[in-house]
Amino acid sequence: MKPTVISADALFDAHRAALKWEWIAGHAHPERRFDEVAVRDAQSAADLVGYLNYIHPYRVQIVGRREVRYLQPGDASGDNPVELQEKRISRIVTLEPPVLVVADGCTPPDRLVAMCERADIPLFCTEDSAGHVIDVLRGYLSQHFAERTSRHGVFMDILGLGVLLTGESGLGKSELGLELISRGHGLVADDVVDLFRVSQAAIEGRCPELLRNLLEVRGIGLLDIRAIFGETAVRRKMRLKLIVHLVRKETLDRDFERLPYEPLFEDILGMPVRKVVIAVDAGRNLAVLVEAAVRNTVLQLRGIDTYRDFIQRHRDLMDSGDSGL
């Protein structure tokens, strides 16, 4: 599911403190929104925010120092610079921007203010640089409009990698998470994980506000991990890099290969995520196994595949006629 709506007043309120901007014109329609088709078609937030450009409609148009000079009558050449200025400013209406932002501490031209009032286009002004405004708004909109879903499991920071522990209820995911926390790793979310596709190649996991810092362990109840283990034991968000799926031993023997030639992946929001399957059985140290799986994944991300190296070594020995034993 991908949200397609945000209003001008919501955008203004979200960054009133950070960007210290003022709402100069276009107060009549604070509910003015982004074009939903443009939001659905956007490949990234860069398609929704940028410097003033007559080729790209339906996006937040940022007017910096150079753009203000372009819209001033003194910059217009010809017999009637005022008429040319009016023409340049009027073209902005055809872009149907949800919001117009004048940055770099510039004073918006009077004709631009009047045009925004007539066309009911919200006009914000800020002392911050145009580049900074673009960075802030792109980051905000990339999260707001991101494809999203929720998954059941425990999401953790293990050795700097975002790892989602999944499996059927009762296998001990939360207990495993608690043991990993005691070994120095960090908790992002327990039970419910909100996942957002924040870019073409990245999925970010966060904890619902209601469950933040909490871990439920059967027989003990709710634990406040931040209060018990300290600030370093929790994380606000992580990029999802690995799924560790816990199964019963009989399920592993029946449904999965012991040494899969091809690595396993699971589709999350249209993006393949590496997956490792670990059997839960008496006497197995799951925390050590998960750490080993994470370390192996780090090697694979660096281009080192132990299993493929072993297969190649085996082929080389067969070709040489030496058993290697």
UniProtKB/Swiss-Prot annotation:
One of the protein's GO biological processes: regulation of carbohydrate metabolic process
Entry annotation: catalytic residues: H152, K173, D191, R258
GO molecular function: ATP binding; magnesium ion binding; phosphorelay sensor kinase activity; protein serine/threonine kinase activity; protein serine/threonine/tyrosine kinase activity
InterPro entries assigned: HPr(Ser)_kin/Pase, Hpr_kin/Pase_C, Hpr_kin/Pase_Hpr_N, P-loop_NTPase, Ser_kin/Pase_Hpr-like_N_sf
Keyword Magnesium: yes
SUPFAM superfamilies given in the database record: HprK N-terminal domain-like, PEP carboxykinase-like
Oligomeric form and interacting partners: Homohexamer.
Protein known as: HPr kinase/phosphorylase
Organism of this sequence: Leptothrix cholodnii (strain ATCC 51168 / LMG 8142 / SP-6)
